Amino acid sequence: MSSPTIAPGRQVSLPSRAIPLSWVLLLAILVHGSLLLMQLPNDSYDADFHKFFAAHYAAHWFNPWNEKWFTGFSQTTYPPMEQQWMALFSHIIGLNLAYSLVQLIAILLLPIGVYRYARIWVSERAASYAAIGSVLLGSLSSLVYQAGQLSTTWAAPLYLIALAYFYEWAREARFMALIKALALTMAAASAHHVTLLFASVIFAIPVMFTAIIDRKRDGLDATLGGVIIRSAVYAGLTIAGVIVVLLPYWVALMHNPIKQMPIPHGSRENFFSQWWLTVNYILVPWGALLLALPFIFYKGLKETRLRPLFFGFWFTMLFALGGTTPFPRALLGAMAGIVNAITGKNIRNPFDILTFERFCFWASLMALPIVALLAVKLIDRYGNKASFVLGTLGAATMAWAVAWPVYHPIHDAPFSTSEVVSFLNRDGHDKFRYLTLGFGSKMSEVGIYANASSVDGEYNSARLLPEMTKYGSAQLTNSKYYGTNGIESLRAVLKHADQYGLKYIFVRDPYYEPLLAFAGWRKTEVYDRGNVTLWVKDGIPPAHPTPYGTPPTAMEGILWGTLPIGSSILALVLMLLFPDRRRTRETLKFPMVESEEPLLREAR
């Protein structure tokens, strides 16, 4: 769509042209940098989880066996790349700032990825608008400042950049594009396993079909068979590479497949069953994008080239609705049934394991190229007024997402764990195991700095203790929120305290005190001005290794400490040593002024 003709002597406003990507990155730094410098993401739900893993890598880079949770578990059960970068940075700037820095890098990668991905379908100008939109996405702010899903925000942009190179490889057979695509894909896989298993496919299928549609565009003469074969080559090499780079992960998964009772999660509920679910999973992450849905459906169905992208968005949006529709549960259940029939396994429906807020983020990213076309249309017609309205809507969307945790807090009031850590690290107390009750995610903070081991932990997929896997509850520290299942799981652990060497229990919620007193624990000390109490049980023997879990071999530790982070370094080196070919274009002076009389003046 061409822009309206400009009257003589009138400047072309910046929104009427492509916004330089460097400016978009500057916007991302201005918008998110101050929040990250304030360490606002450090209060998000999973932040302490990532810092816990990073702290272990900082001290034991080539030994992923961590004895601080679940009486011992392997960190090869979670891809390590961004946590390993945190570990490296933490030696210079500390763990908290390292988390903020790594999160900032992910945020800066996102507009680059969205721009490259959007350019497959839309103009440079529209792609720059999509990149701006990615900075202000409500779903991004929800993941960064509320959920703390660092891995999701790292992996997604890497896949988007990789798929832009895959598009070049599929159409043009450029070997260097294939190499870059593979390196970036390996790096993305090293960041997050769920994004690997779902988003990589969701993002890639529209690109492949668009490459087929575009095989004759821009003077190319690619054949249908050639595009399909090159796509198969990329897919095959990707599968082989992911198996190698994440080999210790696959070994751990084979030794200990996930066999747990489903743990309740809000993203699997009907989002219209409670008002806060509607706000938390629809209004906050989607924000102003909801207003663009009619245009997305209209434009996506109307234009042939946009249909693969639209159907990918539509599919992902249905998953983003979680348990609101039966589609995700039915499809994932059917897939599990097929796998069980082929392998003879008894795999549980993945619906009961997944959380679906990340699908909203992925769907939003796929919607941005189409929404950018709407932005172009509005700005061409209404000029700076449209720019102001669109900017306001984007800013309001992000502001609401950042502010939402204040009005719907995910943590209790802050409290200090320093006295708890001090107790565990002195007088040989670390010979015994401990448990926290009512600590929430602060449990991970204790785990980072205490030398003692706990029977609890925040990573549900790594749990192997039968007292935890047979009940449908998550962390023991939050037992009461899981009803009967949570309390029964806690009671089972207390019953086997001798077996686990569980001597110390730190309680921040009086709700648990009657249960502890009945089970034989006694209150001995008070910390944090009465906020935390210590309960001790006499006669408990020192902790010893348990038979649950298989420590990785030394070779697996070496592979885990080199290949995942090495893939990201390789991708960075390739991008620096082999820059992309740039199209030759005319350099225009700024501000640009029309010197000739237009044929038609802009209607006002």
Can you name each region flagged by the protein language model?
Residues S2-D412, S416-F423, T436, E445-I448, ...:
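Membrane-embedded transmembrane-helix bundle of lipid-linked glycan/lipid transferases
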Residues N425-T469, Y504-P510:
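Short periplasmic/luminal acceptor-recognition loop of GT-C membrane glycosyltransferases, typified by
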Residues R426, K495-A497, L516:
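Structural motif
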Residues S454-Y504:
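Luminal/periplasmic acceptor-recognition loop/helix of membrane-associated glycosyltransferases
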Residues E513:
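Conserved short secondary-structure elements within globular domains
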Residues A517-K523:
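Ligand-binding "clamshell"
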